Amino acid sequence: VFYNPAMSGSRTRSVLLLRHALEEGFLGEGTVYALDGLTASGLRARRWLNELPHEDAERISATIVDLEEDALRWAEASHDEFPPNGGTLEAAKGDLRSVVLRSGRHWVDIDPYGSPMPFIDSAMQSMARSGVMEVSATDTAALTGSSSTALMRRYGARVSTDSLAHDSGMRVMLANFSRVAARHDRAIVPLLSVWDSHHLRVSFRVLKSVSTANELE
C-alpha cells in the first residue's frame, strides 16, 4: 500500500483547515460529507476523524476512494484497529470521477500523482451549496513553466520560469478551477496555497452562486 511520508505536513494542514472550516460555518450545520479521493493508505481521512475535537469529528461522514482493493482493505483494517475520535469511515472502490458523483459533498480532497485536471469537473459537480476543495498537483515541471508544452496542454497557460514560478503555478491552478466552477454556476474563494517540496496545493471554498460565477473574467 502506497504511503508518502513527505505529505505528512499536507495532511496536518488538512486537519487544521477542516477544523477552521467547521468553526467558521463553511460546511453548514449538520453532517459533513467528506471525500478523500485517491486515498491509498486512507491516512488523511483517518486523521480527520482522529485529530478533530470529538464534537467536530462526530459530524464527519468520510468516504475514502481508491482503485486498489488491497489499499482500501488495509485502510479499513487500520481504522478498526485504531478507532477514531468520532465520525464514520466508508470505503469505495472505483474511479474517483464516478464515485464522487454518488452523493453531494461538503469537503473533497484530491491528491493525485501528476495533474489533478482530469478529476476537477466531476468533483465540482458534486459540491454542496457551500463546501471546500483541497487539490494537489505534482506536475510541477508543467505548472512552473519548465515544460511549457505540458503547461499549455493541461492548463491552457504560459508562465515565466523565474523566482515566482511556483506562485504562478498555483495561480494557474486556481484560474482553471475557477473556470470549471463557473461552468457549474459556482464560484471559488481561495483559502490556502502552498508550495511544499515536490507539489503545489491549493485549498478553496466552493459556493453555489450564479451571480458570482458571472463575474468571472
Give the predicted meaning of each segment.
Residues 1-217:
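SAM-dependent transferase fold signal centered on methyltransferase-like domains
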